[in-house]
From Swiss-Prot:
Record's subunit section: Interacts with LPL and SEL1L.
Topological domain ranges for the Lumenal compartment: 73-127, 222-292, 389-567
GO CC field: endoplasmic reticulum membrane
Alphabetized Pfam families for the sequence: LMF1 (PF06762), LMF1_C (PF25179)
Annotated transmembrane regions: 50-72, 128-151, 208-221, 293-321, 368-388
Superkingdom field: Eukaryota
Keywords: Chaperone, Endoplasmic reticulum, Membrane, Transmembrane, Transmembrane helix
BP term (GO), one: protein maturation
UniProt key word Membrane: yes
Region of interest (Disordered), ranges: 1-39
Protein's name in the database: Lipase maturation factor 1
Disease: Combined lipase deficiency: Characterized by repeated episodes of pancreatitis, tuberous xanthomas and lipodystrophy and is caused by deficiency of both lipoprotein lipase (LPL) and hepatic triglyceride lipase (HTGL).
């Protein structure tokens, strides 16, 4: 034994104290939990993630709640029994296409609980899935605790809707929510419902799964821009973005009219956040925290400047995995018996102690290791896509949407086009005196005098698809003809998706048409702004010709759609 080791030094120190008359003071009472030696508040130690898990679960539950709320309010009109693209027709067509496959093969290719349900009342099925999701997500959001079963239920319920949602659920944030939700399953113990499950510390593998997710999201978004539209390289994209984004809000109106140098600064800042900051994740604790702060602030700016559904709120969730308990402690109250106090006590208990092996812990550790191996394996095509000069964005490589590619605004439209639906009560649609009246949607631009909407994190799926439809033809979007037919019949479900029906309290229109317009923000202080107009619009031409109910009868039957209203 070394002579300068602690065990040899202790007797010598004791002997010196006796020779000099020094005596040990009376032992002091240990400080109260959550307090320092002088009674000051104790600080949480770094390296544990008990509070991080609570914040992660609450944030994820909030996004789930919004997603299921959107589903409950809009699914019947979009994919219900008489929806614009009924999911029953979609499921039957899928079943017929794979009629030579086993039921398990069909289910594994497109997993959804709806395969196991009665299709005679699809509206009730869709409502049931959405209400279950709302109930479970509300519980997790309020309590901050969950187990693997509850989180798996949320993931399975939402995946069941995404896989039958057709184009209405084709946005990149659907897969992103499913991947985030899948990781959320492994944050929790199997059975225990506790905010601080003592024997189930937050898995480092799961935390790195979240960090790997935010790394891919941000780097993928940055690379798709640099490889995509030239305006990202010459720093001019922000000259157009606020005006041409899918659903502008009032702040976007003013940001669009910012000085040119401010737009250049925005674009450079975007490249810094998306291309350089993601690598902070691998540079130690402090750099990782800086990464999390910058990403959350960046998403907050995007929320303020546009209505991008719950995408930016969702992107904040994996960023929270950058923070440990010491970083997030300020979010929780102090005091005896508080969560922070209990975490501090748990940190003291486990410091230097070796936990006794438990069967549940062993099983969970094996599950986490398996998760890590699975994520690594499924990441191979994703990494190859990131490195490819032909990078694709918002693509999933498996039916479970576990590891996906991401990206946004790889190209920026320089002009804003809108499809305006109009109806007339005139018996002759081509008559010069036919009076055409506009239908107004809940959020997308229509009436130039209407203030842009402010709805984030909520999401109007029809309005978003109308934005995409304006860049294509109606032949590529047959659902818009279905919508026209429903407007001709004054269908209540379809009208609930709109903000204004010009024929309310009157007989339905005899004809409905689609008109193509170009929209630009009015200039602050200009003539149009003085008239109260946010937009200036100019007609491009017809989007689809005037249609009547009788003309649409064979069109509906060929697609298996129920005939609307009086037909």
């Amino acid at each position: 034994m070394r002579p300068d080791s602690p065990t040899m030094a202790a007797p010598a120190e004791s002997l010196r104290r006796r020779k000099t008359g020094y005596s040990d003071p009376e032992p002091e009472s240990p400080p109260a939990p959550g307090r320092g030696p002088a009674g000051s508040p104790a600080h949480l130690h770094t390296g544990t993630f008990w509070l991080t898990r609570i914040v992660l679960l609450k944030a994820l539950a909030f996004v789930y709640f919004v997603a299921f709320l959107v589903a409950f309010h809009q699914n019947k009109q979009l994919i219900g029994d008489r929806g614009l693209l009924p999911c029953r027709v979609f499921l039957k067509n899928f079943q017929q296409y794979f009629q030579d496959r086993t039921s398990w093969e069909v289910f594994s290719y497109m997993p959804t609980i709806l395969w196991l349900m009665d299709w005679s009342d699809m509206n009730s099925n869709l409502d049931l899935l959405a209400l279950l999701g709302l109930g479970i997500s509300s519980f997790v959001l309020i309590t901050g605790c969950a187990n693997m079963l509850l989180m798996a239920a949320l993931w399975g319920l939402y995946m069941s809707l995404v896989n039958v949602g057709h184009v209405w659920y084709s946005f990149g944030w659907e897969s992103q929510l499913l991947e985030t939700g899948f990781l959320g399953i492994f944050l929790c113990p199997l059975w225990t419902l506790s905010r601080l499950p003592q024997h189930t510390p937050t898995s480092r593998i799961v935390l790195w799964g979240f960090r790997w997710l935010i790394f891919r999201i941000m780097l993928g978004a940055g690379l798709i821009k640099i490889r995509g539209d030239r305006c990202w390289r010459d720093l001019t994209c922000m000259d157009f973005h606020y005006e041409t984004q899918p659903m502008p809000n009032p702040v976007a109106y003013y940001l669009h009219h910012s000085p040119w140098w401010f737009h250049r600064f925005e674009t450079l800042s975007n490249h810094f956040i998306e291309l350089l900051v993601p690598f902070f994740l691998f540079l130690g604790r402090r750099a990782c925290i800086i990464h999390g702060v910058l990403q959350i602030l960046f998403q907050a700016v995007l929320i303020v400047s546009g209505n991008l559904s719950f995408l930016n709120w969702l992107t904040m969730v994996p960023s929270l995995a950058c923070f440990d308990d010491a970083t997030l402690g300020f979010l929780f109250p102090s005091g005896p018996g508080s969560l922070k106090d209990r975490v501090l006590q748990m940190q003291r208990d486990i410091r230097g102690a070796r936990p006794e092996p438990r069967f549940g812990s062993v099983v969970r550790r094996a599950a986490n290791v398996s998760l890590g191996v699975l994520l690594a394996w499924l990441s191979v095509p994703v990494v190859l896509n990131l490195l490819s000069s032909r990078q694709v964005m918002n693509t999933h490589f498996n039916s479970l949407h576990i590891v996906n590619t991401y990206g946004a605004f790889g190209s920026i439209t320089k002009e804003r086009a809108e499809v305006i639906l109009q109806g007339t009560a005139s018996s002759n649609a081509s008559a010069p005196d036919a009076m055409w009246e506009d239908y107004e949607f809940k959020c997308k631009p229509g009436d130039p005098s209407r203030r842009p909407c402010l709805i984030s994190p909520y999401h109007y799926r029809l309005d978003w698809l109308m934005w995409f439809a304006a860049f294509q033809t109606y032949e590529h979007n047959d659902w818009i003809i279905h919508l026209a037919g429903k407007l001709l019949a004054s269908d209540a479900e379809a009208l609930s998706l709109l903000a204004h029906n010009p024929f309310a309290g009157r007989p339905p229109p005899r004809w409905v048409r689609g008109e193509h317009y170009r929209y630009k923000f009015s200039r602050p202080g200009g003539r149009h702004a003085a008239e109260g107009k946010w937009w200036v619009r100019k007609r491009i031409g017809a989007y689809f010709p005037p249609l009547s109910l009788e003309e649409l009868r064979p069109y509906f039957r060929d697609r298996g759609w129920p005939l609307p209203g009086p037909l």
